[in-house]
């Protein structure tokens, strides 16, 4: 018995480890793992089914086939444990050792490991500095390589063909050494002196200047250093011993009918062993060289196929023409080990079934079919039955349950009480896709789901299925109840708004009961309270919509949180009074005293949560649902064909449009308009007609005429069912009603162009064949798009999760003063997002001052909640600097202050919260709602794009920012700066509108002037760009020679002549180097200086510029000297929707990016080349000028002699995020990405908090490039983790040394995921082979910091409740304590052992 205890103790020992290291295996290492050499390719004997000795399944090497029984049957049972049978050589032990014991094959000739050879960049090639082609030719026995040149003129590593080798042999005899095959490469690798090589390369690096050479050298140095530091030897990349996987991991299973199913690996191993044995035999026989060589090549190919089949040449196929699955295929891809078995496992204690509605459930309940519950909770029931003494053994209990005895159901009730279960609906796009509920037993076979949680699950009842999981341990139940219960997840983690919001029927019911109606039954009554209202409604004395006066008691919270009652008579309706009965204490009556649509209900729940907290909100939500369902049923609202009222005006609107189209057609035929213009106009006419029809229809539906009690006619909001459904937000929208009762409108062809004849019919009238046929395309495209969208969106989510998975809140406050300046989002005249929405739930980075004073309004480090935001709004603050994760100083993870409020809980975020995953889910989950297509702007839209003036909407004062201007002769301001912004400020100092003002715009009102709403404040010519003079004087032409640099053109219509500057391509050779310019001189002919500088005013003219002035004319400042026609770039497609979001997060460079100024200085143009011009920026402080070549066809925004700041736009276009980061810094690029992503989501009406996007941006900015190393051990130009540089610099500065300087890098999310420090995480994401190869060569150590790594090694994740566990481990490790392993006492062990023996181990004695 005491032995047994030892044995049990050995079994309970868990592996304790803190990191995982990956490295190259040396031949000795492989032999030390091995339990014996596999010498034969045989697997099992076909008659006895016993493994062959020394074969691939040999019992002597790998262990016994049956528990505690040797192969020949001499020793059986536990008492012989550990004996090695002298007859068959098998150790008597458990059979599970066949899963862990490895074997090996001694290769007769060394073979290269294909991963280190072919995985680009080739490690062997990089190390030897030889091209991959040459190495392959040596390895596959096509050429020789010189290993030792000796005294000859042959270089080491020189490649020789067969002929060259024979010549060399004749010439030098055995002076030199040249070989072929892997032996040659092995010899080369063995003889390398890594340290020496490293030194030489470093010296070379310091001497060289060429960028490409530097890159190459840095790569080699890094690789060599990796080998030196990790202790890997380069020759280990060539295998001399091949490990053999344990047999139970590559099983051979007999099928019925005498056939066998086998793992492909066995085939691949057999090939290797066969060829290896043949090679050994040939070597023993001293066979001719060519035969041996061929056999060696075959062996090399066999080993390649085993490691990574298909990586080189054709994949080896099995009997069924399918390529065999090699070791590499086992781990990579969706079906590989990582993604199939380690990151996603199937779990026990789970079941799935169809879902149906449970409208009578409470929010925290779900209906669970009895059958399912019985199956899921079986072990608990067995336990209870035994405990009660109702069953003597587990077996008896099992029988009782199978018979479904009455007592079993009682016990099931007990077991289930207070035991939450998890419900999950696939696809689980965000964390609300799994929530916990308390089960209620129901008859039937479908799970019942509470209607209010459908929004979170995105579930409907058209056949959706859901899975149920049972949390077993007490801890799991606790977590399910405290964190995952549906009642704890009322707010959405994406935007902090309620997600438990009524929809559809419930909304319709509440809307119906809160509407009022003129002259309804019972109008004008005065009631004592809501109770009486309900009584008279039930008695039929009053209609639900009757306008009445009711005595209402409201409760308000005072400072102490006590409720204070206010009672008053309110004008309301019967329905609203009845609804007031379910509203919790503490909310004002005004909240229900309106027609409640979906938005209003959502706001109501939100207010309730903020004022009263969780519990009342949950109860209120449930009550609203019950009430809504009840009154929706009472309302009897339904849809009939007569509800779709077609407006009378429709007919005349359509005939008007047809007349206009006919007119355009005539103009086209008489040649007044082009085909393109005609098409665009026709489409505009029909689009306008469609709008008019739908407006007429909505006006018609919206109101109805009724007679009030004084007998007069009155308009009131309509009670049309369809209108009510749309107006309340229950179902449908104006656009859909338009198709039912208006006209369907314009349709698109499959290629995306619009068909110019619209469908004038609607669905009520019905479509004719042609109209139906036109419609089919759109319908199909919709379905196809949806399928594509789902896949794309899922992939985006996966990449986002992968890049952000290891970001966890790790400390309370990092203490940084950095932050982002938040301002309201204003586009043109609309506030798209007020400041309040942007800063709510953030922490201030510095004190917020009261505008215009020095008083502190909000102190630094304040979490801005609703009350603070009210204060900011009251004092009209329009910019707040808040903390952001992008500027957080925490090394691993972020701090709670930089993140701010946990949106789903409403308080500051807890430590250990996995904000990275939450951010990824919040951005990815609405992905399916985004569009997939790129938008073609055509027709009406493109003409609207050419704006030519700014018209303000509100009154206020104008504020111009970064503006340079001059006053022209008529006293108006003319803008001469490039990126001027015009803001409209109201009387409280808040920004209401904001516009971009182009160069050359003439301002009607100046900075700080008051304007009225609707006033035009600036206008300009949209088609030409002017050149504006900043000084007055006389014009002097320079280098303007007719026929060489300019040509004179006369306009046919007006007879005015103008000078046109020739493009350099059109000039004669003499004119190529001339620079036409206009110089401004005073009356004496002296240069006039530009005010504020010592530069003479001269304006160089680019090609195509038009000058309408003559030499010597007097001009005044602000006049237009020349005009440059702008080519309208046609209609540009804007990428929208998902592809745009993906481009932003992948940080892809746009096709023709904007060109930004690299440094500040004065612009000039140098010598031009064929297709490019040379832009030179000379800094004012006299340091080196910066030059850049720009293609001629790019329109430049700057003139010669103009001053630019770093990061200014030189040529328009979409900005590349990398440039923004380099020139304007981290905050600018964050702002850019956040705003651009938000624009896409805002267009679809999806709300996502900025925080989530910032979290992803932080992960994209993880890396930095070292510019100068200082005293650190980084290499120049090396890319390292930003946190590592920070930590290293901190240590160096503490010791008074010079730190490294670096620049931050922006990586796309895929790149960033693969560049993470953790190789396990990267390997399980994409490009598994490459990641593992790199990691092995560098001998990387994975510290298991992220979530993914910990899931893969099967540990609690370092987030959430696992965070404390990991913190505790770290503490203990730091203190150097032993980590406690669960000790088994002798008593426990013997007791459990006895039970084991009774249960079945001991049953085999009496055979």
Curated annotation (Swiss-Prot):
Zn(2+) 2 binds at residues 814, 888, 895, 898. It catalyses: RNA(n) + a ribonucleoside 5'-triphosphate = RNA(n+1) + diphosphate. Its cofactor is Mg(2+); Zn(2+). Zn(2+) 1 binds at residues 70, 72, 85, 88. The keyword Iron does not apply. InterPro entries: DNA-dir_RpoC_beta_prime (IPR045867), DNA-dir_RpoC_beta_prime_bact (IPR012754), RNA_pol_asu (IPR000722), RNA_pol_N (IPR006592), RNA_pol_Rpb1_1 (IPR007080), RNA_pol_Rpb1_3 (IPR007066), RNA_pol_Rpb1_3_sf (IPR042102), RNA_pol_Rpb1_4 (IPR007083). Binds 1 Mg(2+) ion per subunit. The keyword Nucleus does not apply. Mg(2+) binds at residues 460, 462, 464. It comes from the Bacteria. Its EC number is 2.7.7.6. GO terms for cellular component: DNA-directed RNA polymerase complex. GO terms for biological process: DNA-templated transcription. GO terms for molecular function: DNA binding; DNA-directed RNA polymerase activity; magnesium ion binding; zinc ion binding. Keywords: DNA-directed RNA polymerase, Magnesium, Metal-binding, Nucleotidyltransferase, Transcription, Transferase, Zinc. HAMAP family: RNApol_bact_RpoC. DNA-dependent RNA polymerase catalyzes the transcription of DNA into RNA using the four ribonucleoside triphosphates as substrates. Belongs to the RNA polymerase beta' chain family. NCBIfam families: rpoC_TIGR. The RNAP catalytic core consists of 2 alpha, 1 beta, 1 beta' and 1 omega subunit. When a sigma factor is associated with the core the holoenzyme is formed, which can initiate transcription. This is DNA-directed RNA polymerase subunit beta'. It comes from Salmonella paratyphi A (strain ATCC 9150 / SARB42). The lineage of its organism: Bacteria, Pseudomonadati, Pseudomonadota, Gammaproteobacteria, Enterobacterales.
